[in-house]
Amino acid sequence: MPVFHTKTIESILDPVAQQVSRLVILHEEAEDGNAMPDLSRPVQVVSAAVANLVKVGRDTINSSDDKILRQDMPSALHRVEGASQLLEEASDMLRSDPYSGPARKKLIEGSRGILQGTSSLLLCFDESEVRKIIQECKRVLDYLAVAEVINTMEQLVQFLKDLSPCLSKVHREVGAREKELTHQVHSEILVRCLEQVKTLAPILICSMKVYIHIVEQQGRGAEEAAENRNYLAARMSDELQEIIRVLQLTTYDEDTSELDNLTVLKKLSNAISNKMEQANEWLSNPYALRGGVGEKALRQVIDNATEISERCLPQDSYPIRKLADEVTAMANTLCELRQEGKGQSPQAESLVRGIRDRMGELKSLVHQAVLGVDKAGVQQTAHTIQGRLEQAVKWLQHPEINDGGLGERAINLIVEEGRKVAEGCPGHQKAEIQQLCDEVERLKRQAAGSGPAAKQAAKQLTQKLYELKAAIQNALVNRIVQDFMDVSTPLKQFTEAVLQPEGTPGREQNFNQKSNNLQAFSDRASKTSRMVAAGGACGNKKIAEILLSSAAQVDSLTPQLISAGRIRMNYPGSKAADEHLQNLKQQYADTVLRMRTLCDQATDPADFIKTSEEHMQVYAKLCEDAIHARQPQKMVDNTSNIARLINRVLLVAKQEADNSEDPVFTERLNAAANRLERSLPAMVGDAKLVATNIADPAAAAAWKNSFQRLLGDVREVRDAIAPPQPPPLPTSLPPPIPELSALHLSNQNAERAPPRPPLPREGLAPVRPPPPETDDEDEGVFRTMPHANQPILIAARGLHQEVRQWSSKDNEIIAAAKRMAILMARLSELVLSDSRGSKRELIATAKKIAEASEDVTRLAKELARQCTDRRIRTNLLQVCERIPTIGTQLKILSTVKATMLGAQGSDEDREATEMLVGNAQNLMQSVKETVRAAEGASIKIRSDQTSNRLQWVRRQPWYQY
């Protein structure tokens, strides 16, 4: 079946598919009784092109040493040649009989063969090119595997000579490959991994120098240095393994995430396969000692298998875990025997055979477990609270639809996240979140069922879920303000402790204390980042993925940084030790800053500043307590915290100003930030005067005044970022109409006649109420829920549900997206149809969808050009740029499917349908994301573009007319 993971393949298949679609249309017209035209000329052109393609293919086979290519390509060449021959025969038959049925059958079979054979040839060649790149990656992995046995500078020099050209080649070839990929996500992963490999390589070499230096001196710290080296080599290996995994991918699901359970399982399974060879080599060597590369590979296989057992289906979990435990016990015994010099004993050899058999069985069980999760098709819960809330609300609004327990799982995860966040909150906030969690669980139990009470409980549950989400996000803003208030001091104090001269009193104790402080800060920061990834206000999948990745990196990097600090303490004169410490410090600082920036981006800046204000007031109260208690140091500490919060507010203000291209907004924000920056030294100066003369009431009064001015400047910054909104219109209902018995005329009006009604005027009809807004033409197909065996219609309905909340009047993006949803619903019918004209209409509908997708992309790009918010604009461009590629692929796949109509049921037909379904789902998801991004971008439009602004008007429900 056609795949389109590279731009080259897509550019070749698109014109071929266009020609085939014309032949399919001619075939349909002939079924209507029309004579087929003379096809000899176009068929001759196709035959010549096929002959040339076959010649190039055979030359490639003869010159290649790729066994898989030499095995797979001949069958693809044979298919293309056979298809070309069918076209020639059909052309000859039609020339003599333009109405020939057998000729038309050969024509459609030949068309199908040309398209699929060409695709197979291209894929065959492309896979061969990928294998070459993977071979280079594996060569680097082999070098990294021996990093642990490099013990002299001569060996290190040779290691570097061997590694450098391989690394350069990997960087060059993977860099060229990522530019060829059509799936943007795959390209981004390759770029990110390459950047990490490039950064880590010199740090690894430096760590190896440190290790060799310590070993040659027979000094202290060899274990820490070896651990540093192994950690860096393992990180580089992981990045290369991820490159290898992504290079082999040919499809992408827009709904998937790097955080999805199935994606994680596939990564773990891939890692097991890659480590198996090293593990078997270790088993085969009776002299291999404990702690070597091979044993570590074996242990990694067991760890990965155990993690898979925790993520797979229950029926697959126990056998994997049991087998992993058996291998662990046997490996421990084998290590002890080899350590005692009994590696060749009958017992050891028996253990080796047993471990090898079980490892093979474990690999097979892991493969089955991953397939089991894939086939089960259990829909993933979203990775953010916003996404989980949408899944839960969808279930609560339509409990009659079987969602496989997705909505209930989403609610459970929201509650679980709420309880996790509550643990780190102060008393009153903790109690509030825990109470909301309890109420959600209670209402969830009451909502089970279909009676009136259950429906009422479902409504209340929806409301409580929104309240819980808001409470979690408020708590997270609190954590971000507190935990990222000062990210530099723990690292700075740790560095100062490391650099203390030898012989300084309490040097070791000070180092231990500052190391513990650094570890505690890292733990807090990474925990907060994980919570923000799940519960942040932005709901951005990419930010969530990077936050989780950064948190894991900080967790693993902190112990290595502390070890590097200890080595530097032990060897103050070593240039290599100092350079290594600086390398890891830079890695750590960059990762923490990235975490802080992403947490800021995931938080509403106005909420952040408001929470910072509240914390400033708390610290100000503590300052007042310090003044009353005559504690100057407490005054200094709390003033420092206020200053840190002010600097964070200034940083957020600068980020918002740099992110905006609206001159009015940036001018107002920068002016407010400058005033705040000028106010800070005055407050700090007044606080110093108080600290030096804690009993002076005049100094205390001056400090209070300067703090209040500072607080006012903070509010001005907040107002500049998010101007205060006017009070909402009253939403209360009018007073109820009293009963007739309660009505009476007052004495004042008793004598007065009622007013006379106006005389009727001819020609004037009474004014009609405004008609309800109904841009629902052709939308009847979405009024009922599609069946589970209609995946394309389900995807189309999902897009329609997203866009129908907006009026398409004065909003071309919404109009185009609605048109796409309706066309996709029609495509869903045509895929299952085999009526006369269905092939022609299938191709025409796919073409219309592709044209509408180009309209959505064009309009989104126009909107992005007008958007003043750089982050929103980048996000909009990223999501909309995927659409044309998917639209082109839809045309090609629809042509393939059209050649299958009338021959349903074959494996090829099923595969074509599956690919078409996946493509349709990706297209609908991309358009849905584009609509959401476009709505956000419309809020931040240049002031000189207001006349062309898209109108985002929510459609009124019928009861508001």
Swiss-Prot record:
One of its GO terms (molecular function) is beta-catenin binding. It is a peripheral membrane protein. GO terms for cellular component: actin cytoskeleton; adherens junction; cell-cell contact zone; cytoplasm; cytoplasmic side of apical plasma membrane; cytoskeleton; focal adhesion; plasma membrane. It comes from the Eukaryota. Residues 258-470 are annotated as: 2 X repeats. Residues 720-778 are annotated as: Disordered. Sequence repeats lie at residues 258-362, 371-470. This is Vinculin.
